[in-house]
């Protein structure tokens, strides 16, 4: 077990995937640490502006901006497509980009903001997600993705927890592939 309860689930030269239990939740939290060999500006383009799904996230069905506060802050509404027989979920996020010039780290934080958008036909889930990009050199960086989701509804945490690492691995692989193609 690593610091703060993180357990290494998968490791390669460029990707490390972790999981850990979260107090007061039946769903695990996941983390990816990814060494990226591309310019940070190219990597940041992969996060879009909230107006559509990120190309590299396979479960995203739709996404749109509800309210843009500034270039660094907005509210977004997203729907994820879950495998049958699980029903799709929707999310309302507060999205905030911050930059720490000392550590050369840019962080995109997504946190629940359910109160600003009405309930829909989908089961409302909540998630806390962080994407941090730390610049190492002009052409390399480390991306750290941390996420924890409360899926809501009647869904088996055991089943969901069993696929979260594989789903994160797929998304990371998709991101790396897109970066190579650009």
At which residue positions do the language-model features occur?
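Eukaryotic helix-grip
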Residues: 1-182
């Amino acid at each position: 077990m690593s610091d703060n309860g993180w357990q290494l689930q998968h490791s390669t030269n460029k990707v490390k995937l972790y999981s850990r239990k979260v107090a007061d939740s039946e769903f695990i939290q996941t983390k990816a640490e990814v060494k990226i060999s591309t310019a940070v500006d190219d990597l940041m383009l992969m996060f879009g502006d909230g107006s559509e799904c990120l190309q590299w996230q396979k479960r995203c069905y739709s996404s749109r901006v509800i309210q843009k506060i500034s270039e660094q802050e907005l509210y977004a509404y997203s729907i994820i497509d879950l495998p049958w027989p699980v029903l799709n979920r929707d999310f309302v996020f507060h999205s905030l980009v911050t930059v720490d010039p000392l550590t050369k780290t840019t962080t995109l934080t997504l946190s629940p903001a359910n109160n600003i958008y009405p309930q829909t036909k989908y089961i409302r889930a909540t998630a806390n997600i962080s994407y941090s990009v730390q610049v190492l050199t002009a052409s390399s960086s480390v991306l750290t993705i941390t996420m924890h989701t409360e899926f809501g509804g009647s869904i088996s945490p055991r089943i969901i927890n069993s696929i979260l690492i594989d789903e994160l691995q797929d998304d990371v692989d998709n991101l790396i592939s897109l970066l190579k193609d650009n």
